[in-house]
Structure formats: structure tokens, C-alpha cells
Amino acid sequence: MVKLGCSFSGKPGKETGDQDGAAMDSVPLISPLDVSQLQPSFPDQVVIKTQTEYQLTSADQPKKFADLEGQRLACSHPEEGRRLPTARMIAFAMALLGCVLIMYKAIWYDQFTCPDGFLLRHKICTPLTLEMYYTEMDPERHRSILAAIGAYPLSRKHGTEMPAIWGNSYRAGKEEHKGTTPAAMTVSTAAAAAAAEGNEPSGKPLDMREKEDPQKAEDVPSQSPK
């Protein structure tokens, strides 16, 4: 420690000295410091001044104003922006459901179901009456429309048949009509008349028969007196 008021002259018996030297010896080496002197005081408010330089061209100014207007409109109706994606999702779901229903109707409903009175056979709705009638038929023939015509019994014939006599005469007349001579026509008519009376046709021309008739008439009286 340093003792206050001590002299460093090294001569304790000497009391002479200047007043200035005595004053310097009496000043302490370490003096206490005040804390307020170490921390400066800060002001309560600070004002900062800045300066900015910018220029707007006539072409960029309306674009910026338009963007600001669009942002203002978008921010003013936030609910409309939320409803738009929801409406799109609902429309997409409805379209998908419609496609599924159409595929179901085309693949399953129409192919594997038949109305009342019909039976499903080979993925085709056929009436029960036809199914009972054509049970023993081939499936390929059963599908065709001509199956009913082909399966119709041929023994049933509607209408009356022509008599044999008239049928023969008609066929004979049709065959002889192709000839060129009128004698053939007369023979055919005579044959038809003979067939109608029940006699067999002679097959000779009419002129020859007329020549033979007088001879037979002469022979008959000549034979009677005998």
C-alpha cells in the first residue's frame, strides 16, 4: 500500500523543499472513478433522414396501377377465390360419375339383364316362346332370323290343289304351246276335251279322225244284216 503524505526523498531529517514538490508528493496515485463518466447518455428519440431518387415512365405507370387494381380486387373478395377450386372439383366428380354410369349401363345392365318375358341366351335376349320352340336347334341357327322360316313344317300347305285332270291338261297345253303348227294346238285341245270326258286321247289329228268316222259308220250297217 501507498501511505498518503509520505515523501520519497530518502532523507527523513531534511525538511527543506519546494512547495510544489511537496504538493506533488501529497497527490494520491489512484483516485476513485464515477460510473456515470464511463457510460454516455443516449437520447430518447432518434431521427433518421433518408433520400430516394426514382423515375416512372409513362408506359410503366399504367401497368403498375393495373396490377395494384387487380390485387385490390382479389383481396377484396377472398371467398370467391376459394369457391372456384371447389366448383371445379364438384364438376369433375360429376363428370366422372356420369362416365361410370354409362359404362355400367353399356357393359353390365344391357348385356346381362332382360325384361319380363325374355331369356338371356348367348348374351342375347330372346323371347321365352321362341326359346321353348327352338330348344333343340343349333345356337348359330337360333340366332338367325330365318330360323323360324326354316323350321316351319313343310307338310302344311295352305290352299287347295288343282285336280289331276285339269293339271295334266294345263301342263300339256303349256308344253304344246311352244310348237309352231296350228295342228298341234288342235290336238292339244282335243286331248284336253277327251281327258275331261274321261276317255283316253287318240293322239291323232282331227282331220284323220273325221276321215275314219265315216268309214266306221259304213262298216256298222253292212255288218248288221248279217
UniProtKB/Swiss-Prot annotation:
Region span, Disordered: 1-23, 189-226
Topological domains annotated Extracellular: 1-88
TM segment ranges: 89-109
Tissue: Expressed exclusively in neurons (at protein level). In all age groups, expressed at significantly higher levels in the medial prefrontal and orbital frontal cortices of spontaneously hypertensive rats (SHR), a model of attention deficit-hyperactivity disorder, than Wistar Kyoto (WKY) animals. In the motor cortex, dorsal striatum and nucleus accumbens, expression is significantly elevated in SHR only in younger animals.
Keywords associated with the record: Cell membrane, Cytoplasmic vesicle, Endocytosis, Membrane, Transmembrane, Transmembrane helix
InterPro entries, alphabetized: NSG (IPR009431)
Pfam family, one: Calcyon
Topology Cytoplasmic: residue spans: 110-226
Predominant subcellular localization, coarse grouping: membrane
Any single Gene Ontology cellular-component annotation: cytoplasmic vesicle membrane
Membrane topology: Single-pass membrane protein
GO MF terms, alphabetically ordered: clathrin light chain binding; protein-containing complex binding
Subcellular location per the Swiss-Prot or TrEMBL entry: Cytoplasmic vesicle membrane; Cell membrane
Residue ranges, compositional bias (Basic and acidic residues): 206-219
BP GO annotations: anterograde axonal transport; clathrin coat assembly; endosomal transport; positive regulation of clathrin coat assembly; positive regulation of endocytosis; positive regulation of retrograde axon cargo transport; postsynaptic neurotransmitter receptor internalization
Functional description taken from the UniProt entry: Interacts with clathrin light chain A and stimulates clathrin self-assembly and clathrin-mediated endocytosis.
Family: Belongs to the NSG family.
Summary of subunit composition and partner proteins: Interacts with CLTA.
Protein name as catalogued: Neuron-specific vesicular protein calcyon
